[in-house]
């Protein structure tokens, strides 16, 4: 009988905090600037420069800790993690080992019908490293220090996950919670949320952990799921062949769907941690914790309950609309403006989702305003434009955030309700399509649809489809 194996997974999730300036200096954290333009002596590790802690970093981390049921450390401090690498100009990273900002929390996930708590071991603050660029010159790597000193919170889970489905559920719940707090945009493609997967396998029924590996270079949930399945299979193959799994860090190549060893996996003692001498401990009072707690927003679970009760929309729609705080804000703001929650939901669920998919965007990337969506819904409801024109206008609202009222006026897209002009067109359509007329009178209802289509085409989509249908039936009696 073949051996059965269990996968054991823990995650280290690095989240870039949404402060305007870096953790220990006043340099901008803006993404995408020209290389080495958001730097100063502090974040490039110049001798004699001294760090000054950004208070907002601490408050964001406290907010995340409270939202994930962690205990906030009342006196926490920073430590130096010593290592040499080109993207680390100080040759050490300021992090937290001995007294991290939060500990002992959990995130509750749901996979299928099963609920499970994933424990959080600790949450600590640290500074990000720079970025190595390997593809500019053939034989040289370049370093961009813009990212050096950007504030990170690292969320370390216990090894409580047993499948890629549980991992993705945990990451999605964590991302949604942090986005609702406004502490980070958590965009994997931009690196503001990064997950390292620590994975081992063991025979089913045993309690001892196997040898773990750490998987890096995972920049999407799909890549994370594929890396987990690939590493699980690799480790099982080694064990089945009587070989040992080496404790190491591996880099995942999503194009090849395989990984390769980067380096042996280090332990804490390899980094020679010692207390950071240039920063005093952070004393966190109960009053400070209470102030942060009081500012906590309405989270997704609370919104789901309220949406069903207040707006009477289907559970599935509510789940999609609340998945992103940005989408939830658009829904609520637009509904407040036009008073039509079900129609707002339909526009977001159908047309917005269609365009997000077409443009390979996430809901956080939406740039159109609630005011313009509300105007579009009002134009369609009033019959000023028909449904096909409304969809055409929405494409421009989505891409350019145009004012739909002005766009309709400037492009002459208002629905034609002039019966005299419509009857003239209908008479010509009937005369030009005798076979369709015969078919309709012979009982073929589809033939009427063809005549409606010809009429809409002749009037460049600006006719009222209901009125066209009504008049055609009257004229063909």
Residues of each region from the PLM?
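Basic, nucleic-acid-interacting segments
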Residues: 1-298, 315, 336-340
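Core structural elements
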Residues: 190-203, 308-330, 341-358, 371-373, ...
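Structural motif
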Residues: 3, 312, 335-344, 382-385, ...
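Amphipathic alpha-helical core segments of compact helical bundles
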Residues: 18, 202, 233, 328, ...
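Extended, non-catalytic structural segments that build the interaction scaffolds
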Residues: 288-295, 332-339, 373-385
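M16/insulysin-pitrilysin zinc metalloprotease superfamily fold
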Residues: 337-338, 344, 352-367, 375-380, ...
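Strongly charged, low-complexity linkers/loops
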Residues: 364-374, 378, 387-457
